[in-house]
């Protein structure tokens, strides 16, 4: 996803840079799992890097684009607790804007395959970003077959709060519940806007022996 986004930004003539080897985890998994000490170390390291990268730039020129809603929330909100603020953009927001500005021109084609979209918790309910991903899909000629629980009523994939690395002791994993909803739409593809969700939904499809492709 990150490589594809970079290629699209280049095509649109966007002036951007990547942190490369200086990029490290935002600390989201550590904080959500209760390891505040590790989170503080990682957040301070990132804040120092951002301060160096954006040195001398006015506030309106400090923008960070991420492909992960967890990073979006952690950098945009959690880091603000340390007095650090940046303008955050999820890649679907930026790409959607570039299309509206005609800096990117998709070649829409009517797909015969049915597709459904999963709203990530940290993109949707936490940050109220619902339409940009859907508008992007529509601009590509894709019709979204919504699951019963969508947008502000969307159901978690099961990865939040550090649960991605934990095994269930009782009951069924949340991702299997969500995957059942996606399969029930008759969709052949599931689009997601979060790497955590992609892992959980993909694992769920494997567990269900489903041929539905996760994008």
Feature roles, as predicted:
Residues 1-215:
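Iron-sulfur cluster-binding electron-transfer modules in prokaryotic oxidoreductases
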């Amino acid at each position: 996803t990150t490589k594809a986004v970079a290629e699209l930004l280049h095509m649109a003539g966007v002036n951007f840079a990547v942190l490369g080897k200086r990029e490290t985890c935002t600390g989201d998994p550590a904080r959500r799992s209760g390891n505040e000490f590790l989170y503080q170390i990682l957040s301070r390291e990132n804040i120092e890097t951002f301060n160096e990268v954006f040195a001398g730039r006015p506030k309106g020129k400090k923008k960070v684009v991420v492909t992960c809603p967890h990073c979006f929330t952690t950098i945009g909100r959690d880091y603000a607790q340390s007095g650090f603020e940046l303008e955050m953009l999820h890649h679907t927001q930026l790409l959607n804007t570039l299309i509206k500005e005609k800096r990117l021109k998709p070649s829409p084609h009517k797909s015969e395959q049915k597709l459904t979209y999963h709203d990530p918790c940290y993109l949707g309910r936490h940050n109220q970003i619902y339409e940009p991903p859907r508008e992007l899909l529509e601009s590509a000629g894709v019709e979204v077959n919504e699951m019963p629980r969508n947008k502000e009523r969307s159901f978690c994939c099961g990865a939040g709060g550090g649960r991605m690395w934990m095994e269930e002791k009782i009951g069924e994993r949340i991702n299997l519940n969500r995957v059942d909803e996606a399969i029930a739409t008759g969709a052949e593809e599931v689009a997601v806007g979060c790497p955590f969700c992609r892992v959980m939904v993909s694992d769920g499809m494997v567990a269900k022996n489903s041929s539905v492709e996760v994008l």
